[in-house]
C-alpha cells in the first residue's frame, strides 16, 4: 500500500505529466525487454535528440536481460547530464544491481523507487537465469515482433523446456521412433540425416536392435551411404553378418502370421534385407514390398524395431495417392452416367412396360430394346410410344367396334362439306331455314355467315379460350375444331401415345359446337333456340353418324336433328324417345362419356348447369 500512496503523492510534488508517462512506457519496455517496441516508445517520449542515445543503451544492456539500466539511465538523464548516462552504458550487469538503490536515493522520488523496486524484482528473477538469458536475447532483438512474444517469462520457460527436450531427443533419437509407428516426418528426417551415428550407438549399446536400425539407415540413404558404408561398417561387419541371419526367420514368421502377405513377396524380404546391408539393390525394390508390411504393422502393431520408419513418408504419399484414385473410381462408379442411368432406366422401363401391357410377349422384347436405347442416352424414349399406340389402338377396337364406320363417314362428309368453315355453315343455315321456323332462326345463321366469312377461326379460338377458363380438355384442341374430324382416324392415334387427348377429341367435337352456339346466340335470347343450336352447328355431319346410332355420345346431342327434319312436334316426341336409349348407352361407352358429361356441365352457364338431358328435353317441353 505504501508504494501506491507514493505513486499518488509523487506526481503532485514533481512534474506529474512527463514522468508518469515515461515510467508507464518503461514498464512496457521492461516486460518486452528484447524487442523494438520499448525503443519506439522511448523515442516518442524523449523527442529532443535523446532517443538516439537511449536506443543504444537499450541494446547494450539488454544483453544481460536487464532493462533496469535503461530506466536508471533515463532517470539520471533528467536530473543529471548525459555523461552519467554514458557511464552507465559502460557498466556491466553485476554493478547494475548495486547501483539501483543509489539511483533511487539520489533521485529521492518515491515514485521512481516504487517502480524500481518492481523492476528490481523482475531483474533479480532474470539474474538467476543470467547465463541462459545472455545467449538468446542477442538473437531475439533482431527478430522484431517475435522478440515481443519470446521476451515474456513464461515463453522463456517454455523454450527452455523445449530446448531441453530437443537436446534429449538429439541425444537419443532412436528412442522416439519406436514409440509410435506413425511418428512425425520431422523425426524421420532427423534420422535420415544421422543414420551413421545411430548405427554406431545401436551396435555398441543395443545389439538386439541392430538389424532394424541398420536396415532403416540403408533404406533411407542407400544412394548416399554406399560410399560411406565401406568406411563405417568396417569396424562392425561381424555383427551385421551374424545377427540378421539369426533374426530374419522370426521376422518372416511374424510377417506370415500377422500380415498374411503373398508368399513370393514374403520370401523376398530376407533377401532384400541381406542385400540392403551390402547396398547392392536400390531402394525402389524394397519400397515396393515393404509398404504392405507397413500396413500390416499399423494394423497389428508388432514390435516397432522390425519396421523401417523412413519408408513411411513415401508410403504415406503412396497411400494418399491410392486413396485419391480409389475415391475417384468409387465416385465414378456411383455417379457414372452410363451405368447408373441405365439401371434406373431399366427399372423404369420394366415398370412402365409392365403397367401398360402386362401379358403381351412383344412387350418383353420392346423392354430390351428400350433398355439399349436408354443406355445410349435415349432416356426420353423409355415412354415407348409404339407400345402406347398399340395399347390405345387395341382399346379403340375393343371399345368402338361399331363406331369405325360412323367415324369414317363423318370423315368423308367432312372432306366434302367441311372443307372450309364457310361451306359448313352455309349448308347448316340452308337446312335450318327449310326445316325450322324462319322467323327466329334465320337471325342465327345469318350471323354465322358473317362470322364464318370474317372471323371463323378467331371466334373459334376465343370460344376455346373461354372454354379453357371453364373446362379442362378444351385447351388441348385450340383452333383445330374443324380439322379434328379429319385427324380422328389417322392423326389422332399417334397423338394418343404422347398425350391421350386426341381420343377425347373424338368424342368432344359435338360438345365444342354447344359452347359455340351458346356464345353466338345471346342476341336471340329465346329459350327454345338454344337446344336447336347444335342442329345448326353441324347438321350434315352428324346426320350420317346418328343414322348408325353409334355408341359415341355424338348421338346424345344430334338426335334432335331428325326431329327438326320431320317436324317440331314429331321432333319433340322423337327426342324424348331417343333420349332414353341414349341413357342406356352411356355406361357402355367407357371413359369418353364421363369426360363429355363433365365437360358439358363445366362449359355451360350457371343457369344451364343441370345436365345435358335437360337441354335435350327443353325443346319437347317448350313446343308442347
UniProtKB/Swiss-Prot annotation:
Record's compositionally biased regions (Low complexity): 102-111, 352-363
Biased composition (Basic and acidic residues): 155-168, 195-204, 422-435, 450-469
Pfam name, any one: AMER
Cellular localisation: Cell membrane
Keyword Cell membrane carried by entry: yes
Alphabetical GO biological process terms: ectoderm development; negative regulation of canonical Wnt signaling pathway; regulation of canonical Wnt signaling pathway; Wnt signaling pathway
Region listing for Disordered, in residue ranges: 77-111, 126-177, 195-230, 342-369, 397-588
Record keywords: Cell membrane, Lipid-binding, Membrane, Wnt signaling pathway
Membrane topology: Peripheral membrane protein
Molecular function in Gene Ontology: beta-catenin binding; phosphatidylinositol-4,5-bisphosphate binding
A single Gene Ontology CC term: plasma membrane
Main location: membrane
Function of the molecule: Negative regulator of the canonical Wnt signaling pathway involved in neuroectodermal patterning. Acts by specifically binding phosphatidylinositol 4,5-bisphosphate (PtdIns(4,5)P2), translocating to the cell membrane and interacting with key regulators of the canonical Wnt signaling pathway, such as components of the beta-catenin destruction complex.
Family: Belongs to the Amer family.
Protein name from the UniProt record: APC membrane recruitment protein 2
Organism expressing this protein natively: Xenopus laevis
